[in-house]
């Protein structure tokens, strides 16, 4: 039997990892985002097959693991980052499997000599896991000659290149400024193999997310409240600073407060469980979005 006939049981190797469980959780926890889920599955497949090839002595350059997540706030970028760190850990590409989320303030100092120690300290904490840099484009401020963000980028570039077996970096933020950021920093762009775009949620998807959020907290929408919330989401999507699932969560928090005040103002009556669970249309319609 030649070495080329050496075999490996794919299903057995797949079952040894928890990738199926992680991908299923991703499907359950995140509404929509079909193209994102598809890309994560593709990356997981590549990493698994690469591992099997190595086990059989087939050598090739390690796949690029650094990633870019672009999209509006509240579209699941951090959640997907967490799942990606789980997949990388299960397949042995990172040693610890933790995800460290940071922003510019965690990396860049305010005076000379302050940035390098800050950035190196963050990198030290992230080693063996995934470093998730949110709104990464704020690292680069070309209009300010005294800005120290470029120093953090230089250190980051070195680590992404020289310690890629110990750390995976995910750069995240709005698509347009991220594209400009990469244009201005081609060294960063060339080190990122996986660019994933996160689409905004539709009204229907956001309504489904709302119901899931409420169910977790043992609330439910009445039929009229569901109609009102659908109208709210459609209107809110057209307003500035809309943050998808994050904006919906904030709206539901306010609806819960209005529900509590409505019930509180009717004290003296006997309350049923249904009344404590139900969010009514008026709890939604009191929002200033309807003014």
Swiss-Prot record:
Its main location: plastid. It is found in: Plastid, Chloroplast. ATP binds at residues 71-78. GO terms for molecular function: ATP binding; ATP hydrolysis activity. SMART domains: AAA. GO terms for cellular component: chloroplast. Keywords: ATP-binding, Chloroplast, Nucleotide-binding, Plastid. It holds the Pfam family AAA. SUPFAM superfamilies: P-loop containing nucleoside triphosphate hydrolases (SSF52540). CDD domains: AAA. The keyword Plastid applies. Necessary for the expression of RuBisCO. Belongs to the CbxX/CfxQ family. This is Protein CfxQ homolog. The gene is cfxQ.
């Amino acid at each position: 039997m030649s070495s080329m006939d050496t075999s490996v049981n794919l299903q057995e190797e797949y079952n040894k990892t928890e990738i199926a469980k992680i991908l299923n959780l991703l499907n359950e926890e995140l509404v929509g985002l079909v193209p994102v889920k598809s890309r994560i599955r593709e990356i997981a497949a590549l990493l698994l097959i690469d591992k099997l090839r190595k086990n059989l002595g087939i050598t090739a350059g390690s796949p690029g693991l650094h990633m870019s997540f672009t999209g509006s706030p509240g579209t699941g970028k951090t959640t997907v980052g967490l799942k990606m760190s789980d997949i990388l850990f299960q397949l042995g590409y990172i040693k610890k499997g933790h995800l460290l989320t940071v922003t510019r303030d965690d990396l860049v100092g305010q005076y000379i000599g302050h940035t390098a120690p800050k950035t190196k300290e963050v990198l030290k904490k992230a080693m063996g896991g995934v470093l998730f840099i949110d709104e990464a484009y704020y690292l680069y401020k070309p209009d300010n000659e005294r800005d120290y963000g470029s120093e953090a980028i230089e250190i980051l570039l070195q680590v992404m290149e020289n310690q890629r077996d110990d750390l995976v970096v995910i750069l995240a933020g709005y698509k347009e400024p991220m594209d400009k950021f990469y244009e201005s920093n081609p060294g960063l762009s060339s080190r990122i193999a996986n660019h994933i775009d996160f689409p905004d949620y539709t009204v229907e998807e956001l309504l489904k997310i709302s119901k899931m959020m409420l169910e977790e907290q043992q609330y439910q929408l009445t039929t009229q409240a569901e109609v009102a919330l659908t109208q709210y989401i459609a209107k809110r999507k057209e307003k500035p600073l809309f943050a998808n699932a994050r904006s919906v969560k904030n709206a539901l928090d306010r609806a819960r407060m209005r529900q509590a005040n409505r019930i509180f103002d009717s004290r003296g009556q006997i309350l049923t469980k249904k009344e404590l669970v139900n969010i009514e249309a008026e709890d939604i319609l009191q929002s200033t979005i309807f003014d």
